[in-house]
Every structure is written in structure tokens, then in C-alpha cells.
């Protein structure tokens, strides 16, 4: 019975009006001082990343290896987004985040 119900729900979903949702995930790479020495520091990557997100107009995007300062930079550059997530070390701001950003 449960399987039949699931099949009916899935079939009925195809009748509903579909809406496109643009979703992506991106490994930001943490803010590492050695990257800056090699010319690939966060200061160089942030504008490229935020321009890419703005250009593609993502509805939702996930990010990995995000330090708090990087999160703040992304939010400042992308005011049309908010996020859900916490730093993994203390459940607040310490450690890397894996935030999910969504359009406000």
C-alpha cells in the first residue's frame, strides 16, 4: 500500500507546473596564506566566485571549506543571498562552514 501511495504521488507531481531551480555546490577552499603567495589567495578567488554566482543567478548554492571571514566576504558581495550554516568547531563561528546560500 505504501509503495502504491508513493507511485501515485510521484505520478501526480508530473501534472503540476514545473519550475526550474538552479542549484550548484562549490568548494571555496579555505583562506590559506600559502595560496596568496602563489597568486591564488582568497582575495583573488572571491571576486571571481561571486561574479560567477551573480552571472548564473543561482537560486541555491552550497559551499564547502568556508572560513568565517570568507563567509562575510561572500555575504557582502552577494547581498541578494542569505545562508544557513555554522562553524563546525563550536557550532557558531569557529572552524569551517558548509553553508547553504539561498536567494532572499
Where do the language-model regions lie?
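Bacterial Sec-dependent N-terminal signal peptides
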Residues: 1-21
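Serine/threonine-rich low-complexity intrinsically disordered regions
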Residues: 1-2, 32, 103
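N-terminal, active-site-proximal structural segment of metallo-dependent hydrolase catalytic domains
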Residues: 16-78, 88-97
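A well-ordered secondary-structure block
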Residues: 97-104
